[in-house]
UniProtKB/Swiss-Prot annotation:
Consequence of changing H197N: Strong decrease in specific activity
Taxon lineage: Archaea, Methanobacteriati, Methanobacteriota, Methanomada group, Methanococci
Family that this chain belongs to: Belongs to the GTP cyclohydrolase IV family.
Annotated protein name in UniProt: GTP cyclohydrolase MptA
Keyword Secreted annotated: no
Molecular-function GO terms, alphabetical: ferrous iron binding; GTP cyclohydrolase activity; GTP cyclohydrolase I activity; GTP cyclohydrolase IV activity; identical protein binding; protein homodimerization activity
Subunit (UniProt): Homodimer.
InterPro entries: GTP_cyclohydrolase_FolE2/MptA (IPR003801), GTP_cyclohydrolase_MptA (IPR022840)
Temperature dependence comment: MptA loses 27% activity when it incubates for 10 minutes at 80 degrees Celsius, 60% activity at 90 degrees Celsius, and 89% activity at 100 degrees Celsius.
HAMAP family: GTP_cyclohydrol_A (MF_01527_A)
Organism domain of life: Archaea
Length: 313
């Protein structure tokens, strides 16, 4: 049947342009081929947006899922494909479907499984991390300026430096009251690990770069993991558990420390990325003895981070 009425093309009652209109929470199964490796299967959640001029009542909403479906099918035919590349292709296709749009944006989040082993026993377990891919496009005349988005979110453990120092002071006071000499106290302090409270830390890094630059998602995952007090694991035998607790308490970190460490490692790792690369670094620590959670964030360009770090060398 040919539908004669296209309400979306009507003029709106209130003629105001809209920054982003689209669909969210759109779930799709994505299969990424890899050269000489098994494909990666991802259950991904998409957000897809275009801008809307003041002269048009609505976007053609059903075109967004249609575009995603088509790009996913095409990705199955290629030898190798990445999340952000899929998103770039979706953005290009959105401009074809929404001829009135001058801006388009796609963001996808997926659970990504890696096989990792525990630190002492070497037991393998499946570890799940969140990975993000995306793209933004701005259309000027017939040219489309693209940027791509790559990111990850990883869970780890942090140990509070403040509480640990309080416990250390209490121990020193108790040892002095029991008659230990300063020399003996120093030997004892060097031999023991002081208690503190822990948090489950959630670290996130998202990079937005011009098209043409490649970022390996595992590099981002490793940076986040190494920036907390210790890594967590799906399987821990007794020796592993002791090791993780010991390592986390030997490496106490505030939520602020985690963000600064991630920023430093991003600068060190991604020397090939241009200064205009946008960087979002975020850490949330879920407190164990407080009713609140701790939060820290850094938003900057890679060039700003480089200059800030150089100024203190």
């Amino acid at each position: 049947m040919n539908w004669r009425c296209d309400v979306q093309n009507f003029e709106p009652d209130v003629k105001i342009s809209l920054t982003r209109v689209g669909v969210t929470n759109l779930k799709k199964l994505v299969r990424l081929k890899r050269t000489n490796k098994r494909p990666i299967i991802l259950l991904s959640t998409f957000e897809v947006f275009v801008n809307l001029p003041s002269s048009q009542k609505g976007i053609h909403m059903s075109r967004n899922p249609e575009v995603i479906e088509g790009i996913i099918d095409e990705a199955l035919e290629l030898e190798s494909y990445e999340m952000e590349t899929i998103c770039e292709e979706i953005v290009k296709r959105l401009f074809e479907k929404h001829e009135y749009a001058t801006e388009a944006e796609v963001f996808m989040v997926s659970d990504f499984m890696t096989k990792e082993k525990s630190p002492i026993s070497g037991k393998y377990s499946q570890e799940i991390h969140k990975i993000m891919g995306g793209a933004k496009g701005i259309k000027k005349d017939d040219e489309i300026e693209l940027t791509k988005i790559v990111g990850a979110e990883v869970v780890g453990i942090t140990a509070c430096p403040c509480a640990q120092n309080l416990i250390k002071e209490i121990c020193i006071k108790n040892l002095k009251e029991k008659g230990f000499s300063d020399e003996d106290i120093d030997k004892i302090l060097d031999s023991v690990i002081f208690a503190t409270h822990n948090q489950r830390g959630i670290g996130r890094i998202i990079l937005e770069v011009p098209t043409g630059y490649d970022i390996e998602i595992m590099d981002i995952i490793e940076i986040i993991k190494k920036s907390m007090s210790a890594e967590i694991h799906g399987i821990l035998k007794r020796a592993d558990e002791a090791y993780v607790v010991e390592q986390s308490h030997k490496n106490p970190k505030f939520v602020e420390d985690c963000v600064r460490e991630m920023a430093k490692r991003v600068v060190e790792k991604f020397k090939h990325l241009p200064d205009e690369t946008k960087v979002l670094i975020r850490q949330i620590n879920m407190e164990s003895i407080h009713r609140h959670d701790a939060f820290a964030e850094k938003v900057a360009t890679l060039g700003e981070l480089r200059r800030e770090l150089l100024s203190y060398e």
